[in-house]
Amino acid sequence: MHQTGNSIKLLTGNAHPKLAEAVASRLGIALTPCHVSKFLSLETSVQIHSSVRDEDVFILQSPSPPDVNDHLMELLIMISACKTASAKRITAVIPCYPYARQDKKDKSRAPITAKLVANLLAVAGADHVITMDLHASQIQGFFDIPVDNLFSEPSMMQYIKQEVDGWRDAIIVSPDAGGAKRATALADQLNLDFALINRKRRRDMAASMTLPTVPPTPTGSEYGSDHGHDDESAIVEKMELLVGDVRGKVCILIDDMVDTGHTVRLAAGVLRDNGASEVYALISHGLLSDTTMDNLRDLPVKKLIVTNSIDQTERVQACGGLLETIDIAPVIAESIRRTHNGESISALFRPHEGW
């Protein structure tokens, strides 16, 4: 069996040490000692307390709010430190890829920051990237190094079968057209029906019905405003059930990311209005901003389930049973083992394959 390094060295920063410890435990190894802190100047300091020369290094870091930028910087510095310490191969394991929603130029002068992050990882010295449930699979094309995009689908299937009463008569729902492929894949695996919700932005519809006008000359005060950000008060979203009959059904919403919870709230409301008996929301990455946490108990769902790609310990405790997590440590550990041994990663996600 081919091995690219003498042994697996698993490092982690401050983003999600609990997940790294769980992955290390499943691999039967100890985390490589690494101290990540800040100088008084707030610059990031990284000290690796064990040799990584000629080793197969995996750095697990999942940048998450409120310290996304600090976590990303930690990851880049750790990669660079291992590179200059003569590691044989460096794999960045990033369960929740940062800036993934900035993946296209959707307005004038908008940066494609997901591409910038890809460039930074490669320049820092990463030879390989492992991530999970990318917001857009095309992000893999931003890299000139190998990228493995893992899927939480098997873990979600297991949760549905074990925790959702009457799941065989449930229906899988995508809250928008963009997530239809993800939701239909899960529905096919479970042999369940599929429903799709259509989302419309009222301001966009109004704008499409008017002729373009010459914009006014900007004033000094306008230069200092958040001109590039949408004014939420000016955008009214409307959702309507486009495909599928949910009356009397247990509905399982599937999406890749929850931040403000706005999409989940609107979609669950539509399903309730159309006669759904219960609504579960299964989301790959729970960013869960402070605003979301304040309103989480009012979400019209029975359960909000997210993976532990981001540490949810405090949020779970604060939600009184509404929020649950799915453990992705097994699939990450197995992907690391297979990468180290030169085995197929795609085999992990074939039907009847186990890990």
Q: What name fits each language-model region?
A:
Residues M1-W355:
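PRPP-associated nucleotide enzymes
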